[in-house]
Amino acid sequence: MKNGTIQQSLSGFYDIWSGGKLYRTRARGNFRKRGLKPVVGDQVEFEAENQREGYLLKILPRKNQLVRPMVANVDLAVVVTAVKEPNLSTNLLDRQLVALESQGIDPVIYFSKTDLLSDQEADALMLVVKGYQMIGYPVLYQRPPFGEEALGELRKILTGKVVTMMGQTGAGKSTLLNHLAPDLNLATGEISQALKRGRHTTRKVSLMQVGDALIADTPGFSSYEDFQMTVEELPHFFPEMQALAPECKFRGCLHIKEPSCAVKNALKHGKIMNSRYDNYLQFHELIANQKPNYQK
């Protein structure tokens, strides 16, 4: 029996990296019967007589798992966020940040397509950048978007980490990876003028060695609907609200209608981004109305 990490999942095959070699395996039939689905990043036990034919036997306990993208045991996520074509959506960005916070994964925000902004639009974006930096999120922003300053900073952050690239279709995840490691030569797609959405140029999830990091390039998405938490848990995944919660009058304050709420007071005085609070209210309503089908 061998131990390794699932590097790629495609059409029922699982490529496992172990001892400097890559082994192609299939999962045993009892995986499906038990409702177990191996994902990229899983630490596993397997058996193989050669590198072409093997069987995946056991998935070891995960420290975390993302649903979109489907990847496990992640240290850090780079949220590639387009500011144009498609236009910047702080709602979509905050959905991804909440998902990462809920799994204990450190986010890095990378703004792409900054070269398409007018000077006035770039000034407006700087306010957004500063807002997220005040929360404590690392934000990489440069015009042009893939300048050496931003790329150099990102390389330092990624060193020694298992990383996932996530973001809306067409945001530039594969383009960013190509700049980090030009020899990858990943396929990239332009935005469909009809839909204003990118073609899904990445169709599989795979872990790639980029410098001293293992990076998952994952398929993009056009929406992000997953909230695997309760309304009581949601405020914990907004760091600026979590920091103020002890100052609220009521323990378990949801920062909506409660009196003497420190979060609403901070909002009133411009210490919390209006867009963040508006998105929080929307997420709260969505969670309150969704069916409780998440798993702890």
From Swiss-Prot:
GO biological process: ribosomal small subunit biogenesis
Needed cofactors: Zn(2+)
Domain CP-type G: 63-224
Keyword Nucleotide-binding: yes
Subcellular compartments: Cytoplasm
Chain positions recorded as GTP binding sites: S112, K113, T114, D115, G167, Q168, T169, G170, A171, G172, K173, S174, T175
PROSITE patterns xrefs: ENGC_GTPASE, G_CP
Enzyme class: hydrolase
Annotated EC: 3.6.1.-
Cofactor note: Binds 1 zinc ion per subunit.
Superkingdom classification of source: Bacteria
GO molecular function list: GTP binding; GTPase activity; metal ion binding; rRNA binding
Positions annotated to bind Zn(2+): C248, C253, H255, C261
Subcellular location, principal: cytoplasm
Keywords: Cytoplasm, GTP-binding, Hydrolase, Metal-binding, Nucleotide-binding, Ribosome biogenesis, RNA-binding, rRNA-binding, Zinc
GO cellular component, one term: cytoplasm
Protein function: One of several proteins that assist in the late maturation steps of the functional core of the 30S ribosomal subunit. Helps release RbfA from mature subunits. May play a role in the assembly of ribosomal proteins into the subunit. Circularly permuted GTPase that catalyzes slow GTP hydrolysis, GTPase activity is stimulated by the 30S ribosomal subunit.
UniProt record similarity statement: Belongs to the TRAFAC class YlqF/YawG GTPase family. RsgA subfamily.
Record's subunit section: Monomer. Associates with 30S ribosomal subunit, binds 16S rRNA.
Designated name of the protein: Small ribosomal subunit biogenesis GTPase RsgA
Species lineage: Bacteria, Bacillati, Bacillota, Bacilli, Lactobacillales
